[in-house]
Design a protein with these regions (language model features):
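Predominantly flavin-linked oxidoreductase catalytic cores and closely associated redox partners
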Residues: 1-86
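Alpha-helical elements of the RecA-like P-loop NTPase motor core of helicases
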Residues: 2-3, 145, 208
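Short capping/connector residues at structural and topological boundaries
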Residues: 10, 28, 39, 52, ...
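Generic structural signal for well-ordered, non-membrane alpha-helical segments
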Residues: 12, 66-70, 108, 114, ...
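Short, well-ordered turn and helix-capping elements at secondary-structure junctions
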Residues: 23, 38, 58-60, 101-104, ...
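FAD-dependent flavoprotein oxygenase/oxidase catalytic domain
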Residues: 58, 81-94, 98-101, 178-198
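FAD/FMN-dependent oxidoreductases across multiple families
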Residues: 64-147, 152
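C-terminal helical "tail/cap" subdomain of flavin- and related membrane-associated enzymes
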Residues: 148-223
Length: 223
């Protein structure tokens, strides 16, 4: 559909590849681990049935240097000692890891060709910035409430709906998306990451500020 609509972002090269698998292994249930490595970062957390979910995104140019996923993990991801330990102490539950290529974090339009985009169609946020599914539900909630309000007030028009949705989407998500892109770039630089973590550890309020600007506020209940 994106190709058929000739959306701007689809014309640009996608630079990311994602790899995901479930494992049997130990990891604190109350934590979500984030481990940077050359050209990407990895998230680790416990999910349903006490499974260990390990998912990482890596720049395509870095991935192409290696024969396969196993070599990439051993040569690149294992350079992070914490991540290496997790992999070596875990047992995979998948016959083959799940992969998604051509991932684009380029800016997208929330309204295109008079189509209201929700979820990833309106903008794909970096995984380090929160729950993409929650954002999809939230954007759908915004659309439904705008339509409901306009119909009840007998003020519905396509133009007004499109403008109102674009404005509210920008207010709710635009800053989070931008912050996510900046943080992802920082994670790709080991030196900057190391210095940044030390600063955040020294100033806890800064960490709360980052969380607020990447994860947003709770979805408000319908009035």
């Amino acid at each position: 559909i994106d190709v058929q609509l000739k959306r701007d972002f689809i014309q640009k090269k996608a630079h990311w590849l994602s790899v995901k698998s479930h494992y049997k292994g130990a990891f604190p249930e109350h934590l979500v681990g984030l481990y940077p490595f050359e050209g990407g970062y990895c998230g680790v957390s416990k999910v349903e049935e006490n499974k260990l979910n390990i998912c990482y995104i890596v720049q395509t140019d870095v991935f192409k240097k290696y024969k396969n996923i196993q070599e990439l993990e051993e040569k690149v991801l294992f350079e992070n000692p914490g991540l290496k330990q997790i992999f070596q102490q875990a047992t995979t539950l998948f016959e083959h890891p799940l992969t998604i290529s051509q991932i684009s974090f380029e800016t997208k339009k929330a309204v295109e060709n008079h189509i209201l985009m929700i979820g990833d169609a309106a903008g794909l946020i970096h995984p380090l910035c929160g729950n993409g599914m929650a954002m999809a539900v939230h954007s759908a909630k915004i659309v439904s409430e705008l339509i409901h309000k306009m119909i009840n007030q007998n003020s519905y028009s396509r133009e007004n709906l499109e403008k109102a949705y674009q404005k509210q989407w920008n207010t709710t998500f635009k800053k989070r998306m931008k912050t996510g892109r900046i943080l992802a770039l920082l994670l790709l630089n080991p030196r900057i990451t190391k210095v940044s973590l030390k600063i955040v550890a020294r100033f806890p309020s800064l960490f709360k500020y980052i969380i607020k600007n990447t994860h947003g506020n709770l979805i408000p209940k319908p009035i």
